[in-house]
């Protein structure tokens, strides 16, 4: 949120100004966000990855309004923003993992709002310049094991043996490590116009778009370069009109 500094984790829980527990925020983060493979947390994680990639762009011409994005913005029109010289470019981030039953990314095809006239724009559209679809490859065997244990234990706790709990924990830990491994991530970048007002797009469609040069795909290390390149191309087209 604009001008909200990130917490450091050491903030205490207080009562009447008296400290009741040190480092309470860090404990809360560990309790709330450790399941990095959870779809909601994974989405936040992907957005943060892309924000950090923006900070690696060439600082001579590209700038990120750090004071605005020092903490995540909820329910804003755009997830992220950067500038090429004095021109603003906006980003929408979507994520999906390989184990998701639904292999379609939502594209945020929504109604807009005209702040100049204070009226809604009723025709749905895509409002960001670039859409980054972050795809996470997970181990299907590990995910199946976790899902199977959940299913069995929801029916009966009898099967919750010490051995099974140990296997379950190992699987969970390995899946979390998978989220933190950059080699498991791929990033598809699509310009607004090439979404063709689709409300969702599949991984197969994204792959086709790459082959048709309507999108690009890269690993995390190449992400800053690809975003700079696409912004420069978009700027060049605008100047040539």
Describe these PLM feature segments.
Residues 1-78, 82-89, 94-241:
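Nucleic-acid endonuclease domains
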